[in-house]
């Protein structure tokens, strides 16, 4: 579960390395986000020459969480880190590559471009 002030690794090549959650989108007073949810975040660490700079406010979709997510068949999926992909307003990623595995729940959320770029979908 990701909440305000949570720091996440960025799993794409948009130029950001780490982001800090400002707000969880989707309803007033919403506290937590899970895989497939959109957050507003600020860039805390960035690589030189990237598309996004340190201090930029961006939207991101969560692709991996340590807490994991429960699936309809009763199983759980958990990852070793908390990671997100920076997106545009039309749900397409800002970067051109995705690093590491992503969860299958992104397919139901309409993030087909992220799913197709990912090296592994679990």
Swiss-Prot record:
GO MF terms here are: large ribosomal subunit rRNA binding; structural constituent of ribosome
**UniProt keyword terms in alphabetical order:** Ribonucleoprotein, Ribosomal protein, RNA-binding, rRNA-binding
Report whether Ribosomal protein shows up as a keyword of the record.
yes
Q: Which Pfam families would you find in this protein's record?
A: Ribosomal_L14
Q: Does the keyword Protein biosynthesis apply?
A: no
Query: Which GO cellular component does the record give, naming just one?
Result: cytosolic large ribosomal subunit
* NCBIfam families the UniProt entry points to: rplN_bact
Q: What does the protein in this record do?
A: Binds to 23S rRNA. Forms part of two intersubunit bridges in the 70S ribosome.
Family, similarity comment: Belongs to the universal ribosomal protein uL14 family.
Protein name, as recorded? Large ribosomal subunit protein uL14
In the UniProt record, what gene is named as encoding this protein?
Answer: rplN
